Amino acid sequence: DEGTSYTQVSAGTTHTVLLRSDGNAVACGNNEDGQCDIPPLDAGMSYTQVSAGGDHTVLLRSDGSAIACGNNLFGQVDIPQLEQGICYTQVSAGMTHTVLLRSD
């Protein structure tokens, strides 16, 4: 989009995910496993980090929660629930796995 700026980009095997300066995320490329189906945000929420894996995408939200979409053959989009007071601070998607850094 003309006039839209991006703050982060991550390339997977056949898809790319971008973080826009307004806190929304967009993805393009092969969507065979739903890796480009970025979940909509709740009001007042934004994405703060994006990471594209092999056939999945992981996103960090402004409230410290994480969400993922796409291929789940190895459980790579299963995001563990956190105890109260703990949040995710960083996300990274590998070929068939996801790494989530916690605040504790």
Where are these regions (language model features)?
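Low-complexity/repetitive intrinsically disordered segments
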Residues: 1-9, 95-104
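Intrinsically disordered, low-complexity repeat/linker tracts enriched for polar/charged residues
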Residues: 6-8, 15, 35, 40-43, ...
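Short glycine/serine- and acidic-residue-enriched loop/turn motifs that recur at repeat junctions
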Residues: 29-41, 70-83
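An edge-strand/N-cap motif at the start of beta-rich repeat modules
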Residues: 4-7, 27, 68, 79
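Conserved core positions of repeat-based scaffolds
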Residues: 15-18, 27, 56-59, 68, ...
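Residue-level detector of Asp-centered blade-edge/turn motifs that repeat once per structural unit
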Residues: 11, 21, 52-53, 62, ...
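Intrinsically disordered, low-complexity proline-rich tandem-repeat tracts
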Residues: 18-19, 39-41, 59-60, 80-82, ...
